[in-house]
Amino acid sequence: MNLDQLEVSHDADSLCVVIEISKHSNIKYELDKESGALMVDRVLYGAQNYPANYGFVPNTLGSDGDPVDALVLSDVAFQAGSVVKARLVGVLNMEDESGMDEKLLALPIDKIDPTHSYVKDIDDLSKHTLDKIKHFFETYKDLEPNKWVKVKGFENKESAIKVLEKAIKAYQG
């Protein structure tokens, strides 16, 4: 995949997210920036599976030095390597052994999957959905040596837009 050839949208209501890890996977993949190949990073050490599709927003730079991460919440698992247009609804703030790490929370645009069209902001998501996401990130590195995570909490769509705007500016230098 050549991201330079991809028409990237940074519109909060129609954001391009490159999926690296499908929902329910227990394998962590990362897109190699040079080759565009989807590389296996590791199999998760514990019994957890990703609670959502996981990827990144191209042409951004998060506080961890990588493109800003995004979870695309859906009842379906999108193929790793696919690009999903999604709309922001919130952000998960966390810290790990490498520093602060924000995860944008998004849903597929209604044209792709209208199942959750009623969700406009983080408060529209069920407590159970947020609890599953929080629990996953609090525990998915537990069995890995020298790795840890502290979940700081969730914030709304407005905060997510600020994280996105900061990441776009950081990428543009």
Curated annotation (Swiss-Prot):
Binding-site residues for Mg(2+) 1, renumbered to this chain: D64, D69, D101
Classification of source organism: Bacteria, Pseudomonadati, Campylobacterota, Epsilonproteobacteria, Campylobacterales
GO molecular function annotation: inorganic diphosphate phosphatase activity; magnesium ion binding
Broad class of where this protein is predominantly found: cytoplasm
Known EC number: 3.6.1.1
UniProt protein name: Inorganic pyrophosphatase
Gene: ppa
Reaction(s) this enzyme catalyzes, per UniProt: diphosphate + H2O = 2 phosphate + H(+)
CC terms in the record's Gene Ontology section: cytoplasm
Keyword Magnesium carried by entry: yes
Annotated signal peptide: none
